[in-house]
Amino acid sequence: MGMTRNHIRQLLSGSVMAACVFSICAMADAPARAQGAAAPARTLAPIPEGDVNALIKKYGLIESKQTAKEMVPDWTKPKMMLVAVDRPDRLAWLQKAVPDVKLVAVRQRGTPAQNVAEALPYAADADAFVGAQPPRLCIEDLIKAAKNLKWIQEPGAGIDDCRDASPEIAAGKFLFTDGTKLKGNVAENLLGMMVTLMRAEDLQVKMDLAPHIQRPDFGQRGWQIAGRTLLVVGLGGIGTDLARDAHALGMHVIATRASSHEGPDFVDYVGLSNELPDLIGKADVVAVAAPYTPETKGMFDAAMFARMKKGAIFISTSREQLVVEPDLAAAVKSGQVGAAGFEINIGPMHEPEGLWGLPNVLITTHQGAPLVEAEGAVSQNENLWVMMRENMRRYTAGEKMLSVAEIAKRGY
């Protein structure tokens, strides 16, 4: 069921057989211990069981056509999985789904190099890497050490950093699943950015920095939202969520995707990726949620910006490599692009070339996960854990998997 406009307006206004690694069983406060003080007691709410069938239906999680037995050469029932966990009782919660599999927990402590060094002794025996928390398990040294590795479960939607961590991953040697459909908070970031730029609220904020109150020069912005056309480039999980929200605000939505012309009812037209040059001129707002692949690198250049409707808004939550930054800067300065907003989401952070400080540009740091959950709401993180636990059960049983990435074929 789609969200109503009132829902959107309200949105805008406003957790046995296991081995413990990195001392997660204690999880005492490190600074307090260092000072000799007793660790403060921590009370964690019980981990909800979750309803995986409801999750599949709500987010449209895609089940693989083949089973794990069919997709993984020489598949055997796993004996051990290496799991990056978020809390000390997470392992027991996961163990209920795979009672005959040894689970080894890892948790972030120290530098990335120290984390890898502590995990290395366990990697050699791991049949699977399951990660939803730091430390990242998708590290080249760990992959090389994991001689029995057959399956990797990553939590994120942007899996290019994992894909590029190892030639074996890029070649599709391992079964790879991710959390691409469970990233509604990223879509909320895009929605907020879009509304901010359409209503020129960014100019109002900058007014607060001036010595006196003065009405901003809105130029050609301060738009009415209803009736405008949004083009979503990359109709995956994030793009679909944004399209739903924009439709609820009264916008017309068109989109592109690499796989097919199929899309939800709230999208008027879904074109293939090669239709982007023809569709981009129809949009008042262009929102990019496409993956970073060799095919998408630099796709938004001077020629593509020239095809946009003059004064249209450009926003992106994708990797910076999709955008030729000097070309975007030139388009903003000339007025061809009326305003632009995007995230700095790969490290180390940098000032985008030619864009930093421009009055019609909104730049944010990457904040894909919510900082504060709504009281009583099931968090995105818990939904991700429910999906990953189900995949652990399915892989162990050799069944069809959820959210399989076709890295060798499509790059994501």
Enumerate the predicted regions with their spans.
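Glycine-rich Rossmann-fold phosphate-binding loop(s) that bind the pyrophosphate
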Residues: 235-236
